[in-house]
Amino acid sequence: MATSIMLSTSFSSTHHPSLFRPSSSLPFSKPKLLSHSSSNPPCWNTKPLSLHHTFNFTSLARSLTKDQENSTLVGEDSAVFDLTKQKISSWIYFTAVLGVVLFVLNVAWIDNSTGLSKAFVDAVSSLSDSHEVVMLILFLIFAVFHSGMASLRDAGEKLIGERAFRVIFAGISLPLAVTTVVYFINHRYDGVQLWQLQSIPGIHSFLWLSNFISFFFLYPSTFNLLEVAAVDKPKVHLWETGIIRITRHPQLVGQVIWCLAHTVWIGNSVAVAASIGLISHHLFGAWNGDRRLAIRFGEDFEKVKRRTSIVPFAAILDGRQRLPKDFYKEFIRLPYLAITAVTLGAYFAHPLMQTASYNLHW
């Protein structure tokens, strides 16, 4: 959900670290020749290896195996954007596709005089007078279609092709997402007020920063915009670098941060209902995503899973994920800069977003 705290305010190349190379001399003592006289034949020291030496060898072997596993990527390097491989024609096509999609979305769904969304929201609202219940129903409908179609992706792509399936997926998911976002914007202050913390000094700045950070987790799909728009053939990716080193499910983490920030700021029952719906959907999405990746990538996914975590930084802290020295470079890439620009742009565009939502009267 792309709204932020400012809704309520007045101002609104794959990295392969070199493998650890063990020393050529193993920690065993060389056999020593005992002193002897001409009358005594030489004899070798047959003292057994000490437990200390054996332990060192075992530790060395385990360390080597762990280092090799952590330094050999089986997934893809995320957020790579090579200008030399970009085609101007592809981005012109992307712009044209985006324009057509937005036009059709407006005429067929959003516009109250021609679209279907108003009738859809009215039908859902007729089920309950509670904005919280309507909010949860809208989330449930979106989640069923979005996650359901994601689960059917492999079969659907085999049946009609990757691009055609992406068009159908987006054609259903996008209108439902827009409807849910607009309903939240229009009714976010219609619930029962549970707490009021907006007057606490510094809380707005803290929550705004939290919301800003959440977008770096929320939108990893910006790494492949041409695939999102089906300009390039859509693929299932097994990412392993960048934000994935911190958490295997960045969208879940970003959504939790976003929900907590907005719920703390708004402080009412509608915000709580929206957060319950969003977080529940993303928890299921994390489980379902792991299941689908395990089916598609098999052992490669299991390797990535072993050295990543869902909880941010957990795999790093317990040593399963070893960050390369230049880890920060995985974030100094165009897609992350694009996320920064779009997030700031959305912040300053909030008055326009609110006005557009209010005019729909959903």
What is each residue range found by the language model?
Residues S113-S125, R153-G156, H187-I200, A229-K233, ...:
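Membrane-interface helix termini and inter-helical loops of multi-pass transporters
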Residues T72-G75, V107-V121, S147-A164:
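Membrane-interface helix-loop junction between the first two transmembrane segments
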Residues L98-T114, I141-A150, V178-I185, Y347-Q354:
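Alpha-helical transmembrane segments of multi-pass membrane proteins
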